[in-house]
């Protein structure tokens, strides 16, 4: 009888059970976080006011340059688990430090920070604030006039060593801390992700289409094109190209909605730039028809 060598046996034998993947080699959570960030960037583009600009991956994940010359830095964080956001969370600490550096220690008065996340607000460990409030909730209370002292103590205990922590430790006046730091930071927590986030984008697209007198019904199909456009712009190596405006959005929507011209899709509504006509001027005849037929018959 014919006997197989050990190597031949190993190569031809079938595994007795499914292959086991290594979870450490998987990055689904990272991909999910990038998708959340880019979707929030797309939503910001659709909600952009007239005269503003959207900057992508410049100071933070995205920034809004306002018509008045201000800059709103937006750090986006997503968690697929049950993690919560506190003032001790690395994402929060890093965003505060970056804001402080970018705003030149708060001296540039028209720079602000938004921390946008799907995470809920959590409580800091080892710290007790008035009313057992969380750090982020108490931050909002300080904006409304609550005592700044407990929040300053919390920040000094949680912030990494650096300029911001040193400045707070120097005991600056409360009104200066409020003006340069507290009043400039917005915490947008528990933001929708997944299908609810997608629904927000679709609704914003539908509103823009209606304003441009384009069919609202195209909004679901355009969502992927908007997302892809954000990815392309975010991938540009030249920072000057990672900028979008409302004019860019309107031009893009007109382009993607009007593919396959002429004719458009069924039920198309007439755009504001179209002009109705009752007749079209045609070029004059070069010769009478009977003359032409006579000449042809004689040839």
Label the model's feature ranges.
Residues 1-30, 78-299:
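Acidic metal-coordinating catalytic centers involved in nucleic-acid phosphodiester chemistry
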Residues 23-26, 30-101:
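Catalytic centers of nucleases
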């Amino acid at each position: 009888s014919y006997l197989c060598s050990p190597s031949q046996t190993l190569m031809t034998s079938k595994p007795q059970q499914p292959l086991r993947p290594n979870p450490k080699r998987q990055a689904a959570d990272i991909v999910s976080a990038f998708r959340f960030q880019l979707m929030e960037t797309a939503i910001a583009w659709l909600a952009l006011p007239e005269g503003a600009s959207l900057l992508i991956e410049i100071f933070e994940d995205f920034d809004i340059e306002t018509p008045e010359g201000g800059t709103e830095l937006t750090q986006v964080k997503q968690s697929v688990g049950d993690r919560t956001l506190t003032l001790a969370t690395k994402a929060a600490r890093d965003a505060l430090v970056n804001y402080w550096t970018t705003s030149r220690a708060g001296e540039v008065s028209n720079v602000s920070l938004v921390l946008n996340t799907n995470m809920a607000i959590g409580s800091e460990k080892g710290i007790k604030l008035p009313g057992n409030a969380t750090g982020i909730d108490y931050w909002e209370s300080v904006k409304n006039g609550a005592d700044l002292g407990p929040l300053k103590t919390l920040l000094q205990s949680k912030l990494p060593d650096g300029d911001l922590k040193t400045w707070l430790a120097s005991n600056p006046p409360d009104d200066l801390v409020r003006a340069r730091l507290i009043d400039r930071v917005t915490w947008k927590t528990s933001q929708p992700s997944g299908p609810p986030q997608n629904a927000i984008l679709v609704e914003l697209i539908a509103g823009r289409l209606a304003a441009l007198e384009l069919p609202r019904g195209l909004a679901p199909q355009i969502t992927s094109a908007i997302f892809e456009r954000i990815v392309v712009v975010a991938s540009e190596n030249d920072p000057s190209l990672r900028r979008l405006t409302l004019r860019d959005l309107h031009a893009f929507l007109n382009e993607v909605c009007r593919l396959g011209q002429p004719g458009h899709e069924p039920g198309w509504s007439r755009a504001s730039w179209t002009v109705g006509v009752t007749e079209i001027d045609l070029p004059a005849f070069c010769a009478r028809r009977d003359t032409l037929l006579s000449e042809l018959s004689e040839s």
